[in-house]
Amino acid sequence: AVSLYLNSFQHLLRWKRDYRSWQVEAGGQVIFIENHSRAGTGFVPVIPNYTETQAGIYGIGKYHLARGGVEAGLRLDMQETRASGYDWTGSPYGGTRKFNNVSYSLGGHYQLSKGWRLTSNFGLAWRAPHVYELYSNGNELGSGMFVRGDSAMHSERSYKWISSLRYGDGMFSVC
């Protein structure tokens, strides 16, 4: 049977301050993951032993108006993945990958009239590849498929714009 040891550590820190019409928030996040397979089980895990360190800091500023408000945010992220293992042929494989990114968002809302509210937000999102996507190499026990990762894979980035017009009168609402 496959036997894996997983240790993880997460820490979040958030600071928030209100000053008149302004609201400011800043924070950070650290995640450490260590995953190792137990030797001597007779099975070769589909992913190698790995450690992953993620860290991020962010800031958000909001300004409130009588009938609406605006907000902007910025986030800096980094991720380092170190993997080392043996594939089903007994050959060593793995490596170290580092990913960095800056993401942002800009949004606002406005009360058009009684019951009507317009909201819009635009932002850049980011996701670094998981160790499975980078270094999987072997038989996946749950599906019986042979899978192989791509250690040259880059992080994903996407833009997202959401706008909505909402009406609500207390008894009824529609978006």
Task: Cite the ranges covered by each PLM segment.
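Flexible glycine-/small-residue-rich
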Residues: 167
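Small/polar-residue-rich segments within soluble enzyme cores
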Residues: 164
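Face-selective signature of the C-terminal outer-membrane beta-barrel domain
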Residues: 1-111, 123, 170-175
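Surface-exposed extracellular loop regions of Gram-negative outer-membrane beta-barrel proteins
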Residues: 34-36, 78-89, 96, 110, ...
